Amino acid sequence: MLSSVDNVSSQPDFTSAEGTSPVTVKLQPGTYTISVIDESEGGGYNAWSRNNGKISGCNNDGDDCAKGWEHGYAFEYGLETKVVAGTGCHDSVKRAVEQKPVNKSFTLDDATDVEFYVVDSGNPTNNLGGVSLRIVKE
C-alpha cells in the first residue's frame, strides 16, 4: 500500500485557473483513497478559510456557517474534475477538524498527473490555511 501526504495551500496563485496553488502528484495506475487529515495525523494544515478567518451565520452547533473554516477541495486528472465539498463551514478550526469529510476514492487506468487544489473563485488573497490530504493506493 503506497501512501503520501500532500498539503494544498489556499493561498493565491494567479497563474492557475483555480485561483489557488495546485499540488500535482504523479500517480500510477490503480485505485486510490483520499482522506482529509490534520496536523495531529502528519498534515501541514488543519483547515482553511476563504475570509481571513472571519466567522458568521453559524447554527448553535457551530456548523453551517456563511463564513468559517472548511475542508473543501478539488482534484482533476485528464478531463475529469472532482469537487469534494467537505462538510461546509464551521465556527472554529477545532470544529472543522471534528467534521472532516468522508474519504473519496477514484481509479486511474494509466500513470497520470493529478492536480489537487482548493476552489475560491472570489478573492483568494484573503485565504488562510489549507487542506492536507493523505492519498493511499489500495
Question: Language-model features: where?
Answer:
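Acidic, Ser/Thr/Pro
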Residues: M1-E138
